[in-house]
Structures are given as structure tokens and as C-alpha cells.
UniProtKB/Swiss-Prot annotation:
Family stated for the protein in its record: Belongs to the major facilitator superfamily. YcaD (TC 2.A.1.26) family.
Domain of life the protein comes from: Bacteria
Keywords, sorted A to Z: Cell inner membrane, Cell membrane, Membrane, Transmembrane, Transmembrane helix, Transport
GO molecular function: transmembrane transporter activity
Protein name: Uncharacterized MFS-type transporter YE1530
The UniProt record lists the keyword Cell membrane: yes
Keyword Transmembrane on entry: yes
Lineage, opening ranks: Bacteria, Pseudomonadati, Pseudomonadota, Gammaproteobacteria, Enterobacterales
PROSITE patterns named in the record: MFS
Subcellular location: Cell inner membrane
Amino acid sequence: MSAYSRPVLLLLCGLLLFTISIAVLNTLVPLWLSHQQLPTWQVGMVSSSYFSGNLVGTLIAGRIIQQLGFNRSYHYSCILFALATCGLMLSVDFWSWLGWRFFAGVACALIWVIVESALLRSGTVTNRGQLLAAYMMVYYLGTVTGQLLLGVVSTQLLSVIPWVSALVITAMLPLLFAHFSHQDSGDVPHIAVWPMLKRRSARLGINGCIISGVLLGSLYGLLPLYLSHQGMSDASVGWWMALLVSSGIIGQWPIGKMADRYGRLLVLRIQVFVVILGSIAILGNYALAPALFILGCAGFTLYPVAMAWACEKVSADKLVAMNQALLMSYTIGSLTGPTMTSLLMQRYSDNLLFIMIAGVALVYLMMLLRKPDQQKTPFAAV
């Protein structure tokens, strides 16, 4: 029996439309704020507000799914995102956009947890890997499509918000024709997340997810601003962001295969080293396209390899708790990365974006080069 049943395909179609909307806004929001002459640190704070919403959404998703089920939770999350998107048209100021992007972040995290949980529930032990692989491919495909759209449509706020909101509402339609059952909360044992964060054997994976969050959060939130300050148009920024994400898609399969064959520790070391090389190449004003390509290949594949490292350290009954802990770790990194980096960029130079990325990557590389039994982390028990 195929893993891609009719409900699964409909769910992935909805996710594709939703992800296109996310990608468009994640690129244009910092550009719109920059056009309004807001300082760089405020642009970074708005990006961090979105990731704060991601963290809150991750924490409340389980209870919402238990109370409402997959379908209703999905529809309400889409409505919340559409409302938060329309709110951007009311006024372009720091405080209101801080709130609207927070609610958008909550909605996005809810959608991610809902889709992932529904796919895992509908799959079996033998095909869950295929389902999650399809999930990642659809997510990145939607991200690239959103970036490419910026080159063919108007990027003015009042032009973009209506069709993006309509796209989100359209993303609700596929799940009107599919149903995902959810067990009662009494059938699901309580899962503690904090002990997973303290697990010594998984510390490299947990730290890797934090570093991945810092890296990708900074790139998503501040790279459009960096490119805009280099004199690029909004359409050009979209093309460069599409190249970055496309390289992440290309790198998924071969890097995953290498991690299975040669070991995740070796591959993590190579990935982090390549991230440092890509950052140095951009700082040195070398060819931007190859530098962004290798940065995307290594950076966008860091999270799944680190996640696999951590998940192989726990038993099957603890996988859900570990996955939730890793997503929280990634979100914390995504929250702190743009905040710290934007403050440094505002005070010193836009080049601090890639200096920061190279710096945190170097710290993680030093951890990876130590023997596993010598690792220390702020989360791991000592």
C-alpha cells in the first residue's frame, strides 16, 4: 500500500500553499520595514517576534490538537495566520508589526506540528520516513516558489497582502475533503520534554539544533536586509533567497545518505566547516552565488542530521518527546539569532551577519571535535 494516500496528498497540497505564503512574508517583511527607515535592530526584533510565536505555538500545539483534532486545529491555525497577515495593512510601525508577526509565528508552528503529527499518525513504521521526506521536500519547494514569485509580482505591501491572505484561505480547502483521526487524550501517555533536554548522550544533537536555529533564523530574517543594503531590488533579493533555499533542497538527499554511511559525527563536522567557509567567502567578496550555494547546502541540512543524532540516542517510546525538545531547541536558536545579530549589525556593520554565523559555527565545530564523553552543554546533566 502506498504511503501517499489521498488524505496525505491533500494535506501536502495545503502545506505547499501555506508555505508559499510564509516564504513571501518572511522575505518581504524585513524589506518593508527597511523601506520605512526603521533601524536594523527593530527589523531584527520583528523577526525574533515571529520566532517567539513559533516557540509558543510549539508549546501549545499538543493541547490544541487533543481538544480540537487535526482538521479543526489546521483550519483555525490558517485563519489565525490570515488575520495576522491582514493586520500588517493597518499600519507600518514597530509595535503593531511586533504583535502581528508574533501571532503569525504561533500559527506557523501550529501548522507544522499539526502536519507532522497527522503524517506520523497516518503512516506506519515502514513508511513514516517516506512521509517525512515528502513533508520536507514540499516545505522547501513552497519556500523556493515563494521566493521566485517575488520576481514576477509587485512587492508593494498593499499588493501582496490580499493575494497572500487568499492563498492561506485556499490552503484550508484540501482538508475539507480529508479527515485525520486523533486518539483521545486518555490513550496518549504524558510526555516530559525537559528530561530530553538534559540527556547527556544527545547533547551534540541538541546543541546542533540550537546552532541551526541561530544560523537559519539569522539568514531568513536578516539576509534579505543585507542584500537590500547592497543595492539589490526586492526581486533580486527573492532570486538570491531562492538560490539559498534551493541549495538546501539539493543537499538533503546526498548529505542524508552520507550521514547514514559514514556516520553523523563526521558529516556534522564537515557541514559546520563548510558553513564557516561559505561565510568567509561572502565576507571576502568572492563569488556570491557559489558561496550562498555551499552555505545553503550545509546550513539547511544541519538540523535534520543533528536531529537524527539525538533521536538515535533514545528508545522508540521517547521519540516524540525528543522531537519536541529538538524543535524547541531550534526555535530558541531562531529566536536569539536574529536578535543578537541585528543589534551587532546596527552598531557595527552588515558584515556582522556572516561573522556571527561563522562564529557560532566555529563554537559548535570545537564541540564536535572533542570526544563525546568530554562534551558539556548548558542543558546536559553533569
